[in-house]
Amino acid sequence: LRLVGSEMCIRDRVKKENDLNQGKWIGIGGKFEDGESPEDCILRETWEETGLTLTDYRYRGLVTFVSDEAPTEYMHLFTATGWTGTPHPCDEGELAWIKKAELRGLPMWEGDKIFLRLLEENVPFFSLKLQYQGDRLDRAVLNGRRIV
């Protein structure tokens, strides 16, 4: 996920069939490869999905996704304000620079709206647990305290 001034670079998952995120706007990122740290992973995934090399980025939080339909997943959140390179098309979805004020109007997971707000408010490093029943956010716990 990249926050840059008043805009954010995210992608619409329209290209992958049978994708859990189909039709939703999500941040840039992916799965760890063997031996990678969170920093290694975000640098590689950003380059693979955008063609950009991050030069100034910050580790912001950890999100735990719990679902009744899938195994638990963990997402490491980063924001970036510096990069080099020229964006290229992504085979996983359409990349776009979206104004922060327009983000909440896009189709996205309800829990994503929570961590986007935390990032925009510059909350210090946080742990967020999001629990879903199907596509519905059932519970959100921020730093051990229930918020939804």
Task: List where the protein language model places each region.
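Single conserved hydrophobic/aromatic residue that forms the stacking wall/gate
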Residues: 1-10
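Phosphate-binding core of ATP-grasp and ATP-grasp-like enzymes
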Residues: 18
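A positional/architectural concept
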Residues: 22-25
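Acidic/histidine-enriched, glycine/proline-rich intrinsically disordered or flexible terminal extensions
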Residues: 125-148
